Amino acid sequence: MAEAQYRGTGRRKNSVARVRLVPGTGKITVNDRPIEEYIPFANLRQVVVQPFGVTETNGNYDVIANVNGGGFSGQSGAIRHGIARALLDVDPDFRAPLKKAGLLTRDPRMKERKKYGLKKARKAAQFSKR
């Protein structure tokens, strides 16, 4: 029989991550590359492993993530969301600490659209009273 696999889908901004957790040593692979190579910023790599810290499961699972859309920040958040959801499959008792840390909530903040007549979403040409 194949070893246990736990799946979770995470989303953040315009990124979608499909995450698999496999019992292992804590190796994280994103789009077939090690996380150190894929995400160049240490603070964003810390974001990715947050769910393991909250549930005290550091180094217990290997993570295989496929992520597309968005940039580094959105993709890191999407992977974190996917890992948190997959950990619920591992043990439903993880729900309380993950929810308390806010890791199960899909962050609804999105980029605001640009409006016509303005330079950006809210940036307008300088106003002249006279």
UniProtKB/Swiss-Prot annotation:
GO terms for molecular function: RNA binding; structural constituent of ribosome. Keywords: Ribonucleoprotein, Ribosomal protein. The keyword Ribosomal protein applies. One of its GO terms (cellular component) is cytosolic small ribosomal subunit. It comes from the Bacteria. Belongs to the universal ribosomal protein uS9 family. This is Small ribosomal subunit protein uS9.
